[in-house]
């Protein structure tokens, strides 16, 4: 790559997590649904149907426009028909925004080698998804649950220079989509799909090389691998003087290779024209609503200031369910460090081990548990035991702590009696070691914890031991 440079542009299709589809009242619930359970005559393009724009989808698009620093937002909503024949497109056309995309001219900021880099976003637009194809025994089976689902297609300028930059951009975009509740943004289930257009040219050359598209990559790590493979292939071809063909590839993670899908043809005429069944509509009212995006940079700064390490910072914005849980818990706990520690490490560690999902009831129970730890009702070891019990039978931590005798002993009178008894039993040992205070403290505290089965509050025990030891020393002298 000494004399060559890569030029990469990325198109990302994002499935919005709205309640209904883009142009119909059908539920937007393609994931884990029975095939063809959520279909509507509008999405199938049956005669006499009239599409209606999903206002929630438009609202999410406006929030994304703020998050991606888009300089131009279209005040009038206009849709076009994109005509082509394929079995997953029952109408024979897709409703999209070719000529008047809802937002243009923005950027996403990434960090590379401790330096901020801007990835230019040319445009993004709203459109509808197609049906999902299943290839079974030589047949193509169609599931129309996904047909008509609301999409946003985000298109970068061809400014990305490496596979590493591509991964960083997609990771940042994904985090933006998650924290703003725009999409679940999971590559593995298709709610975020990226097409990477890769070309290579000699350094100093102004014309672009031949563009090769890589589709259907199911993870961020695989995006990096697929692009690196394609850059290396094109460099090798150019060194040999061989032409690079304009083709579409897909990445096979089992063999770590890019596999040929089809030849690419730029001459396809989609016969775009304005969608006649959707009136152009002014969205000034929607533009006046609060469309302020969540400030991800500020969020990371606050976590860093709270002492949360970068790995955990990234983890909490990696999943919409987890981020929503964090937001709910921290609004009560008001401690990012405690929230992330007990949610991301302790609770999610157990849930992943048990292969159980995170439920609202569990989140409510975790809030109570963290409060119990903060008040000293239970110690950290007891709290971990309570998490296991909570997930086992679904009871709240307060009831479980009483039932299983897992509450800390915090009663000063009770602890003082226990410690005084230990002083009496070890009077000779204490007298011999009055000049070795730490040793005596360790001895007494150890016995207190043993007798209380680790239920005594260590901080309170230490304070009482210190006071009684001081009194004992004065009497002995």
Swiss-Prot record:
The alphabetized list of GO BP terms reads: glutaminyl-tRNAGln biosynthesis via transamidation; translation
InterPro entries cross-referenced by the UniProt entry: Asn/Gln-tRNA_amidoTrfase_suB/E, Asn/Gln-tRNA_Trfase_suB/E_cat, Asn/Gln_amidotransferase, Asn/Gln_tRNA_amidoTrase-B-like, GatB, GatB_Yqey_C_2, Gln-tRNA_amidoTrfase_suB_CS, Gln_synth/guanido_kin_cat_dom
Instruction: Please tell me whether the keyword Nucleotide-binding is annotated for this protein.
Output: yes
Q: Does the keyword ATP-binding apply?
A: yes
Can you name one GO molecular function term for this protein?
glutaminyl-tRNA synthase (glutamine-hydrolyzing) activity
Catalytic activity, EC: 6.3.5.-
Keywords from the UniProt entry: ATP-binding, Ligase, Nucleotide-binding, Protein biosynthesis
Question: Which chemical reaction does it catalyze?
Answer: L-glutamyl-tRNA(Gln) + L-glutamine + ATP + H2O = L-glutaminyl-tRNA(Gln) + L-glutamate + ADP + phosphate + H(+); L-aspartyl-tRNA(Asn) + L-glutamine + ATP + H2O = L-asparaginyl-tRNA(Asn) + L-glutamate + ADP + phosphate + 2 H(+)
Return the Pfam families for the record. GatB_N, GatB_Yqey
| Role description | Allows the formation of correctly charged Asn-tRNA(Asn) or Gln-tRNA(Gln) through the transamidation of misacylated Asp-tRNA(Asn) or Glu-tRNA(Gln) in organisms which lack either or both of asparaginyl-tRNA or glutaminyl-tRNA synthetases. The reaction takes place in the presence of glutamine and ATP through an activated phospho-Asp-tRNA(Asn) or phospho-Glu-tRNA(Gln).
Question: What assembly does the database describe for this protein?
Answer: Heterotrimer of A, B and C subunits.
The family annotation for this protein states: Belongs to the GatB/GatE family. GatB subfamily.
Which protein are we looking at? Aspartyl/glutamyl-tRNA(Asn/Gln) amidotransferase subunit B
Q: Which organism is it from?
A: Mycoplasma pneumoniae (strain ATCC 29342 / M129 / Subtype 1)
Q: Which taxonomic lineage is given here?
A: Bacteria, Bacillati, Mycoplasmatota, Mycoplasmoidales, Mycoplasmoidaceae
């Amino acid at each position: 790559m000494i004399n060559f440079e890569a030029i990469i542009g990325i198109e990302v299709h994002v499935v919005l997590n709205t309640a209904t589809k883009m142009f119909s009242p059908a539920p937007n619930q393609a994931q884990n649904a029975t095939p063809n359970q959520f279909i509507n005559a509008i999405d199938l393009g049956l005669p006499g149907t009239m599409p209606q724009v999903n206002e929630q989808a438009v609202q999410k698009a406006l929030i994304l426009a703020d998050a991606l620093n888009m300089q131009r937002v279209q005040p009038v909503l206009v849709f076009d028909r994109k005509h082509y024949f394929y079995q997953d497109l029952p109408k024979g056309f897709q409703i999209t925004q070719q000529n008047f995309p809802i937002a243009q001219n923005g950027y996403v900021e990434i960090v590379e080698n401790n330096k901020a880099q801007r990835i230019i976003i040319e445009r993004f637009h709203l459109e509808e998804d197609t049906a999902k194809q299943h290839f079974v025994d030589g047949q193509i089976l169609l599931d129309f649950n996904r047909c008509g689902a609301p999409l946003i297609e985000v298109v970068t300028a061809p400014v990305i220079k490496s596979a590493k930059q591509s991964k960083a951009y997609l990771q940042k975009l994904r985090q933006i989509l998650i924290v703003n509740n725009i999409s679940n943004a999971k590559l593995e289930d298709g709610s975020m799909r990226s097409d990477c257009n890769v070309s290579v040219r000699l350094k100093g050359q102004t014309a672009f090389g031949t563009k090769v598209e890589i589709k259907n990559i199911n993870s961020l790590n695989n995006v990096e691998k697929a692009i690196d493979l394609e850059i290396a292939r094109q460099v090798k071809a150019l060194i040999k003087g061989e032409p690079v063909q304009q083709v579409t590839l897909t990445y096979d993670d089992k063999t770590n290779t890019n596999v040929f899908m089809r030849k690419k043809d730029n001459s396809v005429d989609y016969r775009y024209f304005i969608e006649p069944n959707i009136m152009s509509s002014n969205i000034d009212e929607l533009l006046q609503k609060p469309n302020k995006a969540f400030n991800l940079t500020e969020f990371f700064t606050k976590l860093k200031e709270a002492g949360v390490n970068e790995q955990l910072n990234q983890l909490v914005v990696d999943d919409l369910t987890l981020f929503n849980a964090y937001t709910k818990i921290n609004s009560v706990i008001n401690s990012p460090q405690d929230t992330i520690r007990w949610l991301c490490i302790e609770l999610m560690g157990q849930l992943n081990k048990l292969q159980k999902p995170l439920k609202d009831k569990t989140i409510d129970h975790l809030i109570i548990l963290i409060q119990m730890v903060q008040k000293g009702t239970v110690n950290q070891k007891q709290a971990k035991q309570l998490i296991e019990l909570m997930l086992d039978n679904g009871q709240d931590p307060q009831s479980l702590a009483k039932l299983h005798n897992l509450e800390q002993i915090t009663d000063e009178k009770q602890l003082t009696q226990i410690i005084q008894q230990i002083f009496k039993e070890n009077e000779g040992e204490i007298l011999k070691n009055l000049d070795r205070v730490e040793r005596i403290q360790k001895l007494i505290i150890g016995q207190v914890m043993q007798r209380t089965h680790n239920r005594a509050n260590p901080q309170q025990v230490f304070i009482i031991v210190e006071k009684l030891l001081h009194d004992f020393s004065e009497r002995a002298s």
